[in-house]
Structures are given as C-alpha cells and as structure tokens.
C-alpha cells in the first residue's frame, strides 16, 4: 500500500486509503463527503492523511462526534467530513458543526496542522494557544512512557493469589519472578484496586534459565502447544523468544520497580495513579517513569487536563482511548523545583489520605460486624475527613493549574462548562 498511497501508514485503518482514492477519482472542484471514524483527526497513523487533506483539498464542513456514540454498534467515534478537490488558500474557512448538529462556527483551515485536527471556536482556540505557548510537550520532558506487558497468552502468565502461593510453596525461588499486577481497569484517581493478580515475569530480556524455576516450568508446561511462539494455529504469535517467555521483550522492566505513574489505555475518565508499591501492569495500561512525576501527576489529574486533552489531543474512541503518542503531545509548563513544591505537597497529602482510607475501611467493616457503634461512628467521621482532604486538595490543584496556564476568569468558565457538558 505504501507504494500506491501517499497516506499509507503501517498501523492505519483501511478507511484512510479511501480518502485518497476518492480524491483521485474526483474531477477538479468536485465534492466528496465521508461518514466514518474520527480517529485519523488525532491518531499518529493519520498524520499522512491529515497532511494530504490540508495540501490537496478545501475543507467545507466537519462534524466531529468525539466522545459521543452516534452509531450504537460502532466501536469508535464518528465524524462527517466534506471537502472539495481544490487547494485551499490562506484565508479559507470551513464550518464546524457541533455534536447537536444545530450549532456551528467557522474555523480557518490554516489553523489545522498535520500534527492534529482539533476543532475549536475562537475562544477555545485561544486556550489551546496558551497551552502550547506556556507548556512544553511531555515528549520533551525527562520521562519515559511505556506500555504494559504483552504476554501473548494471559491465561498462563497472569495468575491469582492461590496459584502464586502454590508455586512459591513448591519452589520458593518462584517468588523472584512473580510480580503483583494491575490492569487498566484497576486504576483510579491517585489510587488503585489491587485484585490479587500476579504476572509471571519471564521476560526475554532477562535471559532466564527456566530450569532454575522448577515449579513455574512445570506450571507453564501444562499449557502445552498454546505457549509455543511459532505462529501456528493454536500457538502464540511467531517470535524468536523461548516457549516460556512473554511475547514482548520488556526491555524497560526495571521501570516497574521504581516509583511511577500508571494510567489506563481506555477509560471513560482521565485518572492517573502514583505507584510506590512496584506494581507491574498488563497491556491495558501504561507507565510513566522519570523525573518530576508528582508535579506531572498533579496536572494530569486536574480538571483542566481532562477537558483540554480530550478536546485537542486525544485519539478518539468511545472509551476515551489514550495513547503514548497523544499524551506525549500535551504541553505542561516547566517550573523550577521550588515552584513545584506546593503541587507536590498537595499530592502527598492526597496519597496519604487515600492510603488511610484503605487502611480504615476494613476496620469499619469489623466495627459494624461487632456492633461497636462508637467505633463505627468514629471511623466514619475519620473516613469523611480523609475524603474531604482529597476533594479539597484536588480543587486547590485545579485553581493552581488555571493560574499556571494564565487563564482568565472567562476562560476558566469555558473549561468548567465544557466539563459539565
């Protein structure tokens, strides 16, 4: 396809090629409309198509249903795109139709870039311009963002508490390569729900000798041909890895053993967890490792990030798909260590409160079970106080983030109204 189409990309959905094909079939000044996925507006694979449209067409109208499920059976968000086979001039404008299909506004085609198609009225566009003038894209920070573990066969490599205990009982050495695991759906705002799942961490990069782990070897052998990495029917994808190893190399495995940020690939909310417990993650989540993480997570968990990321930087998808590519594009203001301290202190208080909430809830259950009413009342009051600390600190951070991006009172209203809507 790359030899035939200028919009080609190895990971692109097939509909991308129909845009170029349709344009080639049109007569000069001809019109064409599409109703299809909106993912190419912001996804990395759509960069060639975005550039192609900007260079070869005049956009007439776009309706972007980002975050709105128009077609019940569709697995991604949709869009209506109408363009003309004619190169746009510098002053060319097009109509952006709101999701209600009633309200609309004009936007200059020159305000779109091949990096991303983001549709905004002038006031919203002014906020985006502030974000990009004041902030530095995360890809330029001293951090790494990596995906979770792709095993190729989770039924074998992800185990429960009972299986973990049995393997360690048979061979204590098993504990060396059994790691606590979180999935994307376990991630909450500044928190997580550990469901007592574990990963057998036989990563190819470790070059393990499986005979040194007798219980795990015996356990994995019980899955037979399904663990083979030959690409044959009934086995895993073909790789050069050994039968007992995970599908992906996981060269960054040491990052799991550090403090880090964890977030879900697909979530209806933007929630980030600060991990100090050395959790490993499966392929449904990502990790951020590196420097300035507590300051960064304060921005990522803010209301401002939630609204602006999905409006301008996300890759579409009805479940709020978040990718490494799109997150790396989001600009965060770089400030010195002293200026970061107020953000970090508030995050530390939230993390401490979240941990106490976890510690107190079993005590409350015990008090209720034992009909210890005084204890029950005291614990409920303490839990309420801890929840209030989290809520209050999050609201304070929101206001600090507005100030960080130099938002006016009117711009703050736009941000908060977009969240309510």
Where are each of the predicted segments found?
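Signature of N6-adenine DNA methyltransferases within the class I
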Residues: 1-172, 207, 273-285, 293, ...
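Proline-centric
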Residues: 22-27, 188-193, 198-208, 285-294, ...
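Short, flexible loop/turn elements at secondary-structure junctions
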Residues: 36-40, 66, 85-87, 186, ...
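A short, contiguous, amphipathic alpha-helix enriched in charged residues
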Residues: 51-59, 224-227, 304, 308
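Short, ligand-facing micro-motifs at secondary-structure edges
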Residues: 64, 262-280, 298, 306-317
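Non-catalytic DNA-recognition/assembly elements of restriction-modification systems
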Residues: 132-142, 153, 215, 222, ...
């Amino acid at each position: 396809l790359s030899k035939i189409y200028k919009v080609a990309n190895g990971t692109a959905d097939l509909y991308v090629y129909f845009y170029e094909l349709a344009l080639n079939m049109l007569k000069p000044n001809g019109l064409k409309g599409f109703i299809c996925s909106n993912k190419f507006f912001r996804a990395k694979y759509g960069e060639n198509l975005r550039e192609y449209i900007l260079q070869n067409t005049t956009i007439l109208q776009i309706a972007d249903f980002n975050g709105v499920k128009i077609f019940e059976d569709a697995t991604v968000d949709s869009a209506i795109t109408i363009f003309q086979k004619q190169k746009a001039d510098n002053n060319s404008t097009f109509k952006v139709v709101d999701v209600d299909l009633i309200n609309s506004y004009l936007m200059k085609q020159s305000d779109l870039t091949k990096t991303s198609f983001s549709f905004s009225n002038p006031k919203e566009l002014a906020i985006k311009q502030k974000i990009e003038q004041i902030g530095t894209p995360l890809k330029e920070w001293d951090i790494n963002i990596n995906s979770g573990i792709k095993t190729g066969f989770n039924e074998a490599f992800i185990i429960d508490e009972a299986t973990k205990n049995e393997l360690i009982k048979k061979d204590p050495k098993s504990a060396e390569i059994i790691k606590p695991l979180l999935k994307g759906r376990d991630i909450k705002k500044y928190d997580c729900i550990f469901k007592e799942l574990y990963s057998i961490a036989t990563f190819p990069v470790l070059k393990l000798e499986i005979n040194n782990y007798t219980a795990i070897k015996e356990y994995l052998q019980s899955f037979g041909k399904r663990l083979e990495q030959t690409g044959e029917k009934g086995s895993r994808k073909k790789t050069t890895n050994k039968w007992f190893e995970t599908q992906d190399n996981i060269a960054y495995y040491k990052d799991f053993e550090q403090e880090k940020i964890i977030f879900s690939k697909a979530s209806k909310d933007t929630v980030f967890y600060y991990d100090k417990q050395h959790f490993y993650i499966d392929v449904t989540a990502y990790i951020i490792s590196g420097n300035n993480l507590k300051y960064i997570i304060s921005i990522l968990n803010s209301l401002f990030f939630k609204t602006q990321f999905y409006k301008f930087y996300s890759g579409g998808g009805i479940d709020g798909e978040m990718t490494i590519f799109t997150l790396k594009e989001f600009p965060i203001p770089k400030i010195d260590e002293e200026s970061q301290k107020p953000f970090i202190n508030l995050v530390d208080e939230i993390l401490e409160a979240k941990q106490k909430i976890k510690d107190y809830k079993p005590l409350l259950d015990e008090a209720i079970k034992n009909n210890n009413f005084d204890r029950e009342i005291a614990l409920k009051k303490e839990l309420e106080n801890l929840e209030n600390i989290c809520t209050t600190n999050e609201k304070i951070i929101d206001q600090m983030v507005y100030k960080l991006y130099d938002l006016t009172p009117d711009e703050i209203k736009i941000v908060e109204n977009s969240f309510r809507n």
